[in-house]
Amino acid sequence: MVKLAKAGKTHGESKKMAPPPKEVEEDSEDEEMSEDEDDSSGEEEVVIPQKKGKKATTTPAKKVVVSQTKKAAVPTPAKKAAVTPGKKAAATPAKKAVTPAKVVPTPGKKGAAQAKALVPTPGKKGAVTPAKGAKNGKNAKKEDSDEDEDEEDEDDSDEDEDEEDEFEPPVVKGVKPAKAAPAAPASEDEDEEDDDDEDDDDDDEEEEEEDDSEEEVMEITPAKGKKTPAKVVPVKAKSVAEEEEDDEDDEDEEEDEDEEDEEDDEDEDEEEEEEPVKAAPGKRKKEMTKQKEAPEAKKQKIEGSEPTTPFNLFIGNLNPNKSVAELKVAISELFAKNDLAAVDVRTGTNRKFGYVDFESAEDLEKALELTGLKVFGNEIKLEKPKGRDSKKVRAARTLLAKNLSFNITEDELKEVFEDAVEIRLVSQDGRSKGIAYIEFKSEADAEKNLEEKQGAEIDGRSVSLYYTGEKGQRQERTGKNSTWSGESKTLVLSNLSYSATEETLQEVFEKATFIKVPQNPHGKSKGYAFIEFASFEDAKEALNSCNKMEIEGRTIRLELQGPRGSPNARSQPSKTLFVKGLSEDTTEETLKESFEGSVRARIVTDRETGSSKGFGFVDFNSEEDAKAAKEAMEDGEIDGNKVTLDWAKPKGEGGFGGRGGGRGGFGGRGGGRGGRGGFGGRGRGGFGGRGGFRGGRGGGGDFKPQGKKTKFE
């Protein structure tokens, strides 16, 4: 009856009864701490009040009362306030606005009371009291109906969650300004004036429902709460369990926000990374522009723009003493006199060459016939631009001409080689060396001229023609560098005076087609020469007539050079020469100086006495240097002794050792059983290599004794 009397109070009085006193809040906190640990199975009941909130517009008044009490129970927990402050409090009144007219004046007050409950504590009583005031006396039946409605609505809990989630978001957008701030002071005054006469049993039941609803709301709504700041609500009367849960939710929110921030940052980074990629082409263009500045500079050596027509010719041997304008005028007039119109003339910055553009291919072909005409006293060269032909391609269609007269000119060669597109005379110190490179349009033309013009007489001398490039190297290896075959046609001249020149030798060997006097880096003769003839008969004749002839105070020695790689060669060439027949007084320094181009010399000595064994080794940088030195010093003398030369056997072939030979005599460092030096290959051997007299890497089987026989004890 007391409850009914209180229910009859005015709305103003119901306001005072709405929120619970602070003492009840503290009691409820203690109860909540214990209930949070015990009640884990009541999560399904939490959604039940939400379902009733949905039915408030269609069910009878009795159910409306129940639904509002439960509706107030769902949004009021402090946990919910911590996650979504102001959002839930505003959402509930918004839904109540749909209820009958009686409820309309109350939502504002209820909203204030609910906001009060949201801010300090999950006061369940505060939520129930406004429901009683709103219905004016029907709260007596409310509590009895709670249990009935709980049983009826358990099956619909999942649907309530979905429906509430659907309705809450639109309400949240318009409700963010929390009305709790102005309403909270009034509710606090009402708490002080109001003495709650309700039974403790009602409080317990309502608080149990509230705790269950708190747990359920906490688990259902964290996703919504993460977008709203949780700092708005002052945490005064939260229990320890709620604070821990709030901390966990806050951490989850922070993690979610961090993840979102990271995703945003990643998106921004990707956009920033995409922009440089887009900008990269611009940078590359700039870089390529810089890189192309060097080639551009080369292109800019040609005065003027790019070719105006596809029909252009290269013009060379211009007079560099004239200006660009003078050259252009003279070249244009030259073609005009021959009924050819030059569309454009572009000269190089050095004014030694240029390019001329024509209107048609016919004009271009006619202009080619004018090569050799003079412009400012110089005979111009006209030819098609070479383009980007590789060196290999050009070498394949180029011939090397030897045994030319030292006074021959390019014009004289052009008369013989009419198909040549370019002729380059080789000179040294302003004087011709008697050789020239003759380039043709194609490799077939080069082969044709080699066959037809080989041995042709030019200015009283028989010319010798050779291939260049890889083709010429193959011919050298096979001994077919020309049409000649059979015996060697080259003589090796040694003991030559250092003052003798190629011209001096040319006067002696009149039939020679090519003469070469190797020189050291200082331009001084190395004391030997190669003299090539047109045939083996000519070479043999010169050998018989000129051997041991005196030239410039020294007696020369001549011998036939065996073709490289031929079976007549005594052994395989290498970078090391074996020298036998040395005097005991010959030192390594003397031995090295005796061979021009040598880099190191070693004399083999007796391990016990230290005296010379009478032989040694001389190293060179290349096989060519070694071969030239060998041919020059063949049958030569060192310190009055005539020496014998041979190639040092490569590693693993036995015979006289290579680089390790001089270290330890026959036994090398290992004594009489081999070791690293001596006869055993490249310093590994002795007669038996490391293993002794028989076998091993050095291998005694290939050793051919030269000189006296050596016995080991």
From Swiss-Prot:
UniProt entry keywords in alphabetical sequence: Acetylation, Cytoplasm, DNA-binding, Isopeptide bond, Methylation, Nucleus, Phosphoprotein, Repeat, RNA-binding, Ubl conjugation
Biased composition (Acidic residues): 24-46, 145-168, 187-218, 242-275
Stretch list, region Disordered: 1-309, 645-713
Modified residues (Asymmetric dimethylarginine): 659, 663, 669, 673, 676, 682, 684, 690, 694, 697
Ranges of compositional bias, category Basic and acidic residues: 288-304
N6-acetyllysine, modified sites: 9, 15-16, 96, 102, 109, 116, 124, 322, 352, 381, 402, 448, 471, 480, 516, 524, 575, 580, 649
Domain RRM: 311-387, 397-470, 489-563, 575-650
Comp. bias intervals (Low complexity): 56-111, 169-186
Sequence repeats: 58-65, 75-82, 83-90, 91-98, 99-104, 105-112, 120-127, 128-135
GO biological process, one term: negative regulation of apoptotic process
Cross-link (Glycyl lysine isopeptide (Lys-Gly) (interchain with G-Cter in SUMO2)): 301, 328, 374, 381, 516, 580, 592, 627
Gly residues: bias regions: 653-702
Record-linked InterPro entries: Nucleolin_RRM1, Nucleolin_RRM2, Nucleolin_RRM3, Nucleolin_RRM4, Nucleotide-bd_a/b_plait_sf, RBD_domain_sf, RRM_dom, RRT5_SRSF_SR
Post-translational modification: Some glutamate residues are glycylated by TTLL8. This modification occurs exclusively on glutamate residues and results in a glycine chain on the gamma-carboxyl group.
PROSITE patterns (UniProt xref): RRM
Main location, first listed in the record: nucleus
Modified residues (Phosphothreonine): 69, 76, 84, 92, 99, 106, 121, 221, 371, 409
Localisation: Nucleus, Nucleolus; Cytoplasm
Ubl conjugation as UniProt keyword: yes
UniProt GO MF annotations: calcium ion binding; DNA topoisomerase binding; ErbB-4 class receptor binding; histone binding; identical protein binding; insulin receptor substrate binding; laminin binding; mRNA 5'-UTR binding
Subunit (UniProt): Identified in a IGF2BP1-dependent mRNP granule complex containing untranslated mRNAs. Component of the SWAP complex that consists of NPM1, NCL/nucleolin, PARP1 and SWAP70. Component of a complex which is at least composed of HTATSF1/Tat-SF1, the P-TEFb complex components CDK9 and CCNT1, RNA polymerase II, SUPT5H, and NCL/nucleolin. Interacts with AICDA. Interacts with APTX. Interacts with C1QBP. Interacts with ERBB4. Interacts (via C-terminus) with FMR1 isoform 6 (via N-terminus). Interacts with GZF1; this interaction is important for nucleolar localization of GZF1. Interacts with NSUN2.
Function: Nucleolin is the major nucleolar protein of growing eukaryotic cells. It is found associated with intranucleolar chromatin and pre-ribosomal particles. It induces chromatin decondensation by binding to histone H1. It is thought to play a role in pre-rRNA transcription and ribosome assembly. May play a role in the process of transcriptional elongation. Binds RNA oligonucleotides with 5'-UUAGGG-3' repeats more tightly than the telomeric single-stranded DNA 5'-TTAGGG-3' repeats.
Protein name listed in UniProt: Nucleolin
Gene name in the database record: Ncl
